[in-house]
Amino acid sequence: MEGGRGVTRVLLVDDSPVDRRVVQLLLSSSACAGSFHVIAVDSAKKAMEFLGLKEEGKEQAIDMVLTDYCMPEMTGYELLKAIKALSPLKPIPVIVMSSENEPQRISRCMNAGAEDFIVKPLQSKDVQRLRNCSPANTQCCDAGSDGKPPLLLLPSDHVVVDATAASPPPPPSRRRAHFAGVAMVLHSSSVELSHYFPFLFKFILLVYAILCLGELLHRWSNGCFLNLWCA
């Protein structure tokens, strides 16, 4: 069930601090207009502990899970299956993220019940896909009622293809995806650090003045205050 006034509570699961920061910055940006409240954990086991705190009969603590695919100890795929088994009558929407666009991996997750599969890093164009998978939205990314295999949105270009007939596209560079996430974090950090530049400049001037004063006192004590070339 969604939070008050249309706020979707998202449980973010990712072992990468950079990728967690990218998602948090994006979903808390002005473009999202307060549509999401993000709770972040760094492992699938911690996510299971969080979900296990729910008492039977109570409302769900979160509205959807956004998880990385590759994580140590317990993968995002294993977390997906555990969540679907945890609440079969009222399943929690699960969106899987990965830096590799592999059709077999996408098909595996979708067949296990994932609502969507997004290639990292998460971008502004992916926000609507998260909204589509909200419990309040009946047009989520499910299989059609005709029993045909689900049509998957490959996140690299958002072209709809059939998972059973698509030829494997060249996987995107993991390094490129990682660098894009790092660049986004560095950009936000540079904005925050810019406020400290005046203070840093004044501090450097103060240190320089202290060093100059120390040199003058040293020359004075040696009796050569006016001799600039005194050794």
UniProtKB/Swiss-Prot annotation:
Keywords, in A-Z order: Cytokinin signaling pathway, Phosphoprotein, Transcription, Transcription regulation, Two-component regulatory system
Domain Response regulatory: 9-135
Coiled coil: none
InterPro entries: ARR-like, CheY-like_superfamily, Sig_transdc_resp-reg_receiver
Domain of life: Eukaryota
Post-translational modification: Two-component system major event consists of a His-to-Asp phosphorelay between a sensor histidine kinase (HK) and a response regulator (RR). In plants, the His-to-Asp phosphorelay involves an additional intermediate named Histidine-containing phosphotransfer protein (HPt). This multistep phosphorelay consists of a His-Asp-His-Asp sequential transfer of a phosphate group between first a His and an Asp of the HK protein, followed by the transfer to a conserved His of the HPt protein and finally the transfer to an Asp in the receiver domain of the RR protein.
GO terms of biological process kind: adventitious root development; cytokinin-activated signaling pathway; phosphorelay signal transduction system
Modified residues (4-aspartylphosphate): 68
Record Pfam families: Response_reg (PF00072)
Tissues of expression: Expressed in roots, leaf blades, leaf sheaths, shoot apex, flowers and panicles.
Disruption phenotype: Dwarf, albino, lesion mimic and low fertility phenotypes.
SMART domains according to UniProt: REC
Inducers of expression: By cytokinin in roots and shoots.
Role noted for this protein: Functions as a response regulator involved in His-to-Asp phosphorelay signal transduction system. Phosphorylation of the Asp residue in the receiver domain activates the ability of the protein to promote the transcription of target genes. Type-A response regulators seem to act as negative regulators of the cytokinin signaling. Involved in adventitious (crown) root initiation under the regulation of CRL5.
Stated family: Belongs to the ARR family. Type-A subfamily.
Something else known: Crl5 mutant plants overexpressing RR1 display significantly increased adventitious (crown) root formation compared with crl5 mutant plants.
Name of this chain's protein: Two-component response regulator ORR1
Organism expressing this protein natively: Oryza sativa subsp. japonica (Rice)
High-level lineage: Eukaryota, Viridiplantae, Streptophyta, Embryophyta, Tracheophyta
